Structure formats: structure tokens, C-alpha cells
């Protein structure tokens, strides 16, 4: 009888959700192919572990960057296309601070805050990394968080608050205008040159043939701590309770006495702070910075958020990690130039199989 029930359920699944079945079969095939390659020696185990580690690093970057985006959507119900340029703004603010502290007293302030531009002090002269200049990096991280939070709050006050009653499409279009303004302001201030950030011997650790970069470890650890802090904030504080209530039903939250406008401000502050931290850490791990860094990442961040479930903060975290690891594992079969394609294929598959994402129905909770 049990076997007949399983057969009946399987038959219903094939008839009702054939797309899910097809992709499940493909997924199982790919997993077995990886195991086959490892078993036959076609692929070395250390290569597989490197793919997983690099995927985790990318995933934590996308997850942390996606938290602020999900916060904005869950409370204000619009896709903020200025989010990528907020990432970049945080990175520039933080790294200008790190350069200033690392070289203060040896070089002029003007040459330091330009962050290694054409007429500025280069990163090799300062030797910035997690071992040589930890205090400069810590100060840069804090400034990136504070200034991006302040910038987010300012943009809300000037642009989004007067449009609070507008629909999501109108707010989204407004955010595109904000993105263009921020990017052009950064271009005017810092030019478009790609600049190196870190110098000296960046520490590396090799375990079982897998290399773990010091800046990669820093990103993963700090991002994990920030995500844990966000979880504690949402689940165990009055602010978090108010945010979850407002995300679930804004009108009901207002009727019950929750100060909705204050919650909106706190959302921008917290989301902006996390976004600034993400920008600073991503630039640290990459070792370079450009005015288009955040814009280039934005589609991947959106993909991570969609994968996890739009408006779900936990979904953004998990979606980022899954997307990062899966896209790096795709290197087993495709060239590196197709990594973006692999990431978006994963997103499209999720939209076909589960349109609401992994954490569907959950917003900030």
C-alpha cells in the first residue's frame, strides 16, 4: 500500500509539476557527474574544494549586499535600483578613510582620500592589508556603514519620503534616477580609473591543498557576524518586532500604534549600514575599486534576492550563498566567462519551479 502511495504521489508530481521533475533529474545528474569526475581522477578533490570555498566567498558577498535590498522591499515595497551605487558609495567612503588613517602623517590628506587615483598615493606605498593595517580597515568598515546609512536616510528624506504614497513602479524609476546621480557624482569626484586597494603580502593559508586568502576569510567572518546580528535584531528586539509587523501588514501595524515612519527610517539606517559594509568588504576581497563596482554587482544581488524570495532577509542570505556556490561549481562544465550566465540560469530555474523563492511568504521574519 505504501509503495502504491509513493507511486501515486510520483505520478501526480510528474503530471502537475513536470518542470520541477525535469530540473530535479538534471540536478541529480550533475551531482553524480561531479562524483564521477572525482572518482575517476578527472577532477582533483582540492579543485572541488576551491570551487566551494570561492563560491562561499561570493555567496556571502551577495547575501550581505542583498539584505539591505530585501529590507527596503519588505518595508517600502519597491525594488531599489540605487542599491548598487549605495554599495559603491560605501566602498569609496570606507576606503578613503582607510587610506587616510594608514598614511596620515606621511602623506598629504588630499593624496590619500583620492584612494590611489592618478595623482594620489598608491596602495603599495601604504601596504594596506588585514595584518599590516587592521585599525585602518576597521575604521574604514565603520565609516562605510555610518556614511552609507546617513546617505540612505538623506535620500529617503529628499526623494522617497515625498513619494511615500506612490506605487512601486514610480519609486523604482525614481531609484534609477538616484543611481545615475550617485554614479556621476562618484565619477566626478574620483574619476573612472580602476584603483588598487591592498598592498604588501596579503596573508594566505593552505589547508589540504586549498588556499584561503586572508581577505576572503575576513569577508566571510565579518559578513557572517553581521548576518547573525541582523537575525538577533529582527527576532529579539522591539525594533525587529516592529519591522516584522510592518512588513506583514503596514496598515494594521499603524493602527496598533507602531510608529511606521520611525520604522522606515530605521530600515534605511540598518539596511544602508549593512550595504556600506558589503561594499567595503567586497572591495577588500577583490583588491580593486571602480565607480561601477556596485552597478556591476546589482543584477547578481537581485538574482540572489529573487532566489531566496523577494522581501525575505533570510532568503537574501541563503539565496546569495546558494547562488555563489552553484555558479562557482558551474566551472566544472563551463568556462569562467559564462559565470554570470550560470547565475541567471539558476535564477530562471527558481522562477519556473518556485516563483516566490525559497523563503516564500516570509518577509523580514
Task: Describe each region flagged by the PLM.
Residues 103-178, 318-323:
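Alpha-helical transmembrane segments within multi-pass membrane transporters and channels
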Residues 64-69, 147-150, 299-324, 345-351, ...:
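Hydrophobic alpha-helical transmembrane segments of polytopic membrane proteins
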Residues 2-64, 79, 107-129, 167-168, ...:
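Membrane-interfacial amphipathic/re-entrant helices at transmembrane-helix boundaries
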Residues 1-37, 189, 193, 251, ...:
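Cytosolic-side transmembrane-helix boundaries in multi-pass membrane proteins
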Residues 213-289, 318:
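Helix-loop-helix "hairpin" substructures at the membrane interface of multi-pass membrane proteins
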Residues 47-106, 158, 163-165, 309-313:
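Single transmembrane alpha-helix segments in multi-pass membrane proteins
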Residues 84-89, 155-156, 160-189, 293-306, ...:
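Pore- or pathway-lining transmembrane helices of multi-pass membrane proteins that form conduits
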Residues 39-54, 233-238, 264-308, 329, ...:
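Inter-helical junctions in multi-pass inner-membrane proteins, predominant
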